[in-house]
Amino acid sequence: MKFSLFFSVFFLAVLHACLSESEIDLEDEEHFMSSDSFLSEIQDESRGKTCIERNKECTNDRHGCCRGKIFKDKCTCVKNGKTEKCVCTQKKWAKIIESYIGDIPALPKPVDDKCVPKHADCSKRKDECCKGGIFKYQCKCYDMYDDDGEKTDLCGCVSPVEHQAIEGALRIAKKLIGDRWGR
C-alpha cells in the first residue's frame, strides 16, 4: 500500500511539472514569435558565398565547390610530400548519371518572395512553400494561445516526416553508391 501511494504521489508530481507553464516558458515563446526564422537567416547568409568552379583549387574552402547539373562537386585532395593540393572534381558516378540524364532545368530560386522558404512564416500564403531537395515543402500550422486566451496560428514551411525519410534513404543510397564506384 505504501509503495503504490508513494508512486501515485510521485506520478502526480511529475504530471503537474510537465503540464504547468512557468514564466520562462512564456518568455521563450515570445522570443520565438518575435524573431524571424533564424534558420532562414543562416541560409540567406550561406547563399551569398561564391562557389569554387570545377577543376579549381579548393584547399582553403573544402566545402565550397559548385554544383553540377544535378550533383554537387567534391573537393578531392592529393598529398605531395608535406603539401596538400585540393581540387573541385566531379565523381565518376555523378558524371555518368548526368551524361545519361542530360540537361535538367534548374530549380527556380525564390525571387521577390514568390515562394516561402523553409521554416519561414506561411500563415498568409499556405500554398506557396518553396521546393526542397525532391519534394515541395508543406505549410504546417499550430494553434498558439496568448495571455488573453486569443488563438493565433503559428505556421511554417516544413518537410513532412515521410518526405524526410525518402530523402534520407536516397542520401544514404547515394553515399553507398559513391563509396563503391566513385573512387
Swiss-Prot record:
Coiled-coil parts of chain: none
Disulfide bonds: C51-C66, C58-C75, C65-C88, C77-C86, C115-C130, C122-C139, C129-C157, C141-C155
Tissue-specific expression: Expressed by the venom gland.
Signal peptide (UniProt feature, chain positions): 1-20
Propeptide stretches in the record: 21-47
GO term, biological process aspect, one: killing of cells of another organism
GO CC annotation terms, alphabetical: extracellular region; membrane; other organism cell membrane
Main location: secreted
GO molecular function, one term: toxin activity
Positions occupied by motif Processing quadruplet motif: 44-47
A Pfam short name: Toxin_35
Predicted alpha-helix: annotated span: 164-177
InterPro entries hit by this protein: Spider_toxin_CSTX_knottin (IPR019553), Spider_toxin_CSTX_Knottin_CS (IPR011142)
Residues recorded with modification Tryptophan amide: W181
UniProt key word Cytoplasm: no
Record's keyword terms, sorted: Amidation, Cytolysis, Disulfide bond, Knottin, Membrane, Neurotoxin, Secreted, Signal, Target cell membrane, Target membrane, Toxin, Transmembrane
Maturation and modification: Cleavage of the propeptide depends on the processing quadruplet motif (XXXR, with at least one of X being E).
Keyword Signal (UniProt): yes
Localization annotation: Secreted; Target cell membrane
Reported function: Spider venom toxin that exhibits cytolytic activity by forming an alpha-helix across the membrane. Lethal to insect larvae. Causes instant paralysis and death in the larvae of the flesh fly (S.carnaria) at doses of 20 ug/g, at doses of less than 10 ug/g causes reversible paralysis. Has cytolytic activity against insect Sf9 cells. Causes stable and irreversible depolarization of fly muscle fibers, leading to contracture at higher toxin concentrations. Destabilizes membranes.
Family membership: Belongs to the neurotoxin 19 (CSTX) family. Double-CSTX subfamily.
Domain notes: The presence of 'disulfide through disulfide knots' structurally defines this protein as a knottin. This toxin contains 2 'disulfide through disulfide knots'.
Name the UniProt record assigns to this protein: DELTA-miturgitoxin-Cp1b
Organism from which the protein derives: Cheiracanthium punctorium
